[in-house]
Amino acid sequence: MLMATIVASALMFGWAESAVSMPCRAEAFLPSGRIAVGANYWASHAATEMWRKWDAKAVEEDLHVLSENGINLLRVFPNWADFQPIHACFLSGDNFDKVYETRMFDSEEPLPDTPCGRAGVDERMVVRFEEFCDIAEKRGIRLIVPLLTGQMTFRNFIPPALANRNPFSDPYALMWEGRYLECMVSRLKAKKAIVAWESGNEARILGRSENAFQSEAWLRYVHQTIRLADPSRPVIGVDGLSVSREGVWPSAMNAALSDYVTTHPYGFWGSVYNDDFNSVRSLTFAAAQTLALEQIAGKPAFVEEHGSRRQEQTSQRGVADYMRAMLWNLWAVDAKAMLWWCAYDQTGMTIAPYNWRPPCVELGLFRRDRTAYPAVATMRKFAAMQEKLSFAALPRAKPDAVVLAVDDDVIHSSYILARQAGIFPAFASPEEKLPDADCYFLPDAQGRAYLTIERWEELKSKVCGGATLYLSWNDTFLDSLEEVTGVEVSFREKRGGLDICDFGDFKVEMPYAIKRKFNALTAETLARNQDGDGVFFRNRYGKGTVYLSIHNFEKTFYERVGRYESDGFKIWATVRPVSRIVETGDKNVFVSEHVFGGGRICVVVNNSPVPYDRRPTVAEGWRVTDTATDAPELAKFKDGRILLGPNCGILLIVERK
């Protein structure tokens, strides 16, 4: 009865409600409240040359191993150069730059008068892809097909006729892209294993888009061509989080043209790599990006690629532990899937690009001989746990505050600080109409913080009406700041240093690059530095409250090592105090609450390499009635205590007594 209540209540509390607004084809592909686990696939024997070196027996064995280990969702890539091997035949003399005819193959054969031939598509490759689909269907494996692949592991596999042409703008290239897409989708749409189409692999870097107008024109053309040929399946957008309209591939545009949006949150680029691989920073990166993308873009999001450079980052066991916590974190934010890069290692291959300097060739879940790494068991156990649950889907967690941010690093930093403070955040673009909320965070408010006049007036109106606003200063020059924040700048000098900020019951070290001092006008000073200068203020604005931090520590913490082990999160907790039904007392053991009827599902995740063994605080009048975990040997709730091994998670069902 309890589990039936959870299922029914999910319809009332968010996850199913949002599903109604998305296309039916999308919800059927990756429903909310579950995490599909999968991989990106190239054949173990030949990688990017699998189609020209087709070996059905090897492929069948690959897919057998994957399906036996619970990996039933694959992203599989038709190598564009192999599937459309067209050559441009040029004139000479004054017309040297004019294409007179397009032929196929290095032997320059005339285009056959067939549907494939007129599209410049090699019939043999399509037949092989159809055979692949049949093998996948037999194994119960679903397929995502990025059609214009294209970009792959630092190399562009472009048809010879299109070499050195911009695929986003060149008319000749666009014509052949359209023919290719129409041919491939029309031919392959009968294959039941295919569940979604995609423009290509990381298609935004197939070439160089000049601006967002060109990006939209190209993506609209590609997606409409796919949908005309097959309106029954979802079409996935290009990857990545790009909040501002000023970007070349803005997420709002991408989402408007797509049924799904995706992240490729590798943890070895940029500042996410500052802390250890199994630290809270790394473990939450995929969840933060995917949550922000879905909320800002307004379309369901999932992790389409993710992986690790093992030798550089951690041990094999470390990857398995990392994956466990990462999956729990993704589930808590209602990411829909996680596909690892990639299924099989690409060791021992001298073909380009695997013999080049940049690629890491040991990224697989399995070695080339198909033996599994420890992370495979992690994926299998997580998938099995979901199948054993008595409820269909995890209801979405209700957000406690809205974060307005554009910068990727600030978004992730804000997510960490919020979750450490017990706040479940929602994200929104400061350029778009603001969602209603009781509390808004405006971290790293550089300049006008991307707020237009309309958005700033809207935000002030919400605060005046009773909402809370937090702003961290970064040479901010929004109008009426003295009135809103109750402070004014009295000193600014470009020299670095360290403030030790005293909040009374805790202290936080704040590194800075610019020294600033502020005068309190109508604001109350809540914290001071070692010189007695105010660093954190509170001001009444209408019926609402405004908090100001003179340090944009959300940004500066992210640029440095180990900052998330400090008490910085307590600043956010001061702004938005939250009481949970279950509280762990450890900033890195996150709890999210998911409402069902009169009860709660609490997802508890240890985002630390250190075991957690403590009696949590359970709110008076509530009791834990059931649990679930993917690692029962490491995660337990017994006699009122939670025991979580490193990077482990547990689900608690909590009901009123």
Regions found by a protein language model. Give the residues of each.
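Short, charged N-terminal beta->alpha structural module
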Residues: 220-222, 230, 398-421
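Substrate-binding cleft of secreted/luminal carbohydrate-active enzymes
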Residues: 306, 319-355
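Glycoside hydrolase catalytic-domain groove-lining segments
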Residues: 213, 233-238, 242-311
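Active-site mouth of glycoside hydrolases
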Residues: 24, 29-253, 258, 349
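Aromatic-rich peripheral "rim/lid" segments of glycoside hydrolase catalytic domains that contact
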Residues: 343-397
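A conserved amphipathic helix/loop scaffold
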Residues: 448-657
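Short, well-ordered secondary-structure micro-motifs within conserved domains or adaptor modules
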Residues: 434-448
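A short, well-structured beta->alpha microelement
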Residues: 242-244, 417-435
